[in-house]
Amino acid sequence: MSSAFKAMRLHLTCPLPKQVINIPQTLFSYLITNQRAINNSCKPVKTSNAKKPKLPTTKLSWEERLSDTVTPLWRMTYEDQLQWKYEHQKKILLKMMKELSQDPTRAFSDHLNFPLLPIVASPVRDGYRNKSTFSVNKGIDGNPKTLGFYIGTGKAGNIVCVHADHLLSIPSKHKMVARCYEDFIRLSPLRPCILFDDGGHWREITIRTNSTGHTMAIVYFHPQSLTPEETDIHKAALVEYFTQGPGAICQLDSLYFQETTMTRCSHEQSQYQLLYGQTHIYEEVLGFKFRISPDSFFQVNREAAEALYKTVAELSQPCVGGTLLDVCCGTGAIGISLSPQMERVIGIELIEQAVEDAKFNAALNRVCNCEFLAGKAEVVLPDLMGSLSSDGGLTAVVNPSRAGLHYRVVRALRNHSAIRRLVYISCKPDGEAMRNFRELCCSVGLVRRITGEAFKPVVAVPVDLFPHTPHCELVLVFER
């Protein structure tokens, strides 16, 4: 055991929560001093002969280049960022109106004939992210066990992994956990998994935090040819590092581990294994408490999410009462937040774990008028619409991913005449969402099997959830 490690252990003052698994007393030091004996099939990482990336050809530092990649607006004042985003959203809406004006039977003009309200600023500008994923790859010094974000592309073969310590959007707690995980995998005898067919095991880490500082870490691991017993040794070492070793300074509340041979997979495809701590962390939004699982969707900026949900609630005020359809509902944040002003809320979500969280959240907050359904919206919604009563009216709120809504979802919404108002939340309105806008507003018969009355845009509000980046959420209201 190194003297530095002994010193850090002697000076740890953070309280250690109760462990979930039993760990051999001296396992971590055993791994450090006996790396080759753990798994003979895994060669220690050699960095002395690794090719180092060329220095930047410009005068920018690696840190500046990463900031320009991840947070391109970081050099601007926040007021200038908001103005830039407002003008960008205006251009997108003008593009939408130009496309809608091509419909020969609709009286759309090619200019903005509905109000674009002022952009809603984020209450917090720095360190706002409650979820960050740090990748593993070759660093500036050539070390393949470097945690951070990428500069370059795999296609060009010039990827460099740069530490994220300087990025404005990431909180210090996330940076601390990432640095500790980097330290751990550098001490481990297992190689990093950079390319699946090249072998290696340690992959990225995702860190989730809430506003009170509770922290969940999810470590991703490629088992390759390791036996379950061999993998268990490294899982135990990981737990010991974050509870009794230098990583204890992170004070993790939850430590999860996912073994997978795929780039991305759900909890259903490969179970998240709780190695240590609590099963969930919790966050409060607009007075409601929400449970967060390892893979459940939750807006990355809590304070700005509150502003977003308030905006959606205000734009839904004319339709108070009746039923709210919350499509792509995630953990139920929007539906539960709007539940006091609705008679009934029905949420639809693809990820089963998120639906379980949504149901739990409704019960936790004693909200009795919400129900949540798991499945693809394009499968669930058409059948659901036929069983809904139009008494009291129907309001739809849709919050899809960047892929937008499936055509069958739009068709079901269009063809149900009781829906008079639809609130569309998009983080990328100039992407696939633009197709949805056309489908919602096009003439009857112009798109296959759409027979319902067309919508028209009536008001738009940008909400900044992502300071220092070009992105924001656009809330666009359609009526008919």
Curated annotation (Swiss-Prot):
<feature type="binding site">
    <location>
        <position position="399"/>
    </location>
    <ligand>
        <name>S-adenosyl-L-methionine</name>
    </ligand>
</feature>
<dbReference type="Pfam" id="PF05958">
    <property type="entry name" value="tRNA_U5-meth_tr"/>
</dbReference>
<dbReference type="InterPro" id="IPR045850">
    <property type="entry name" value="TRM2_met"/>
</dbReference>
<feature type="active site" description="Proton acceptor">
    <location>
        <position position="473"/>
    </location>
</feature>
<keyword id="KW-0949">S-adenosyl-L-methionine</keyword>
<keyword id="KW-0496">Mitochondrion</keyword>
<feature type="active site" description="Nucleophile">
    <location>
        <position position="427"/>
    </location>
</feature>
<keyword id="KW-0808">Transferase</keyword>
<dbReference type="InterPro" id="IPR029063">
    <property type="entry name" value="SAM-dependent_MTases_sf"/>
</dbReference>
<feature type="binding site">
    <location>
        <position position="349"/>
    </location>
    <ligand>
        <name>S-adenosyl-L-methionine</name>
    </ligand>
</feature>
<dbReference type="InterPro" id="IPR010280">
    <property type="entry name" value="U5_MeTrfase_fam"/>
</dbReference>
<dbReference type="GO" id="GO:0070041">
    <property type="term" value="F:rRNA (uridine-C5-)-methyltransferase activity"/>
</dbReference>
<keyword id="KW-0819">tRNA processing</keyword>
<comment type="function">
    <text>Mitochondrial S-adenosyl-L-methionine-dependent methyltransferase that catalyzes the formation of 5-methyl-uridine in tRNAs and 12S rRNA. Catalyzes the methylation of uridine at position 54 (m5U54) in all tRNAs. Specifically methylates the uridine in position 429 of 12S rRNA (m5U429). Does not affect RNA stability or mitochondrial translation.</text>
</comment>
<keyword id="KW-0809">Transit peptide</keyword>
<keyword id="KW-0489">Methyltransferase</keyword>
<dbReference type="GO" id="GO:0008033">
    <property type="term" value="P:tRNA processing"/>
</dbReference>
<dbReference type="GO" id="GO:0005739">
    <property type="term" value="C:mitochondrion"/>
</dbReference>
<comment type="similarity">
    <text>Belongs to the class I-like SAM-binding methyltransferase superfamily. RNA M5U methyltransferase family.</text>
</comment>
<keyword id="KW-0698">rRNA processing</keyword>
<feature type="binding site">
    <location>
        <position position="299"/>
    </location>
    <ligand>
        <name>S-adenosyl-L-methionine</name>
    </ligand>
</feature>
<protein>
    <recommendedName>
        <fullName>tRNA (uracil-5-)-methyltransferase homolog B</fullName>
        <ecNumber>2.1.1.35</ecNumber>
        <ecNumber>2.1.1.-</ecNumber>
    </recommendedName>
</protein>
<dbReference type="InterPro" id="IPR025823">
    <property type="entry name" value="TRM2B_chor"/>
</dbReference>
<dbReference type="GO" id="GO:0030697">
    <property type="term" value="F:tRNA (uracil(54)-C5)-methyltransferase activity, S-adenosyl methionine-dependent"/>
</dbReference>
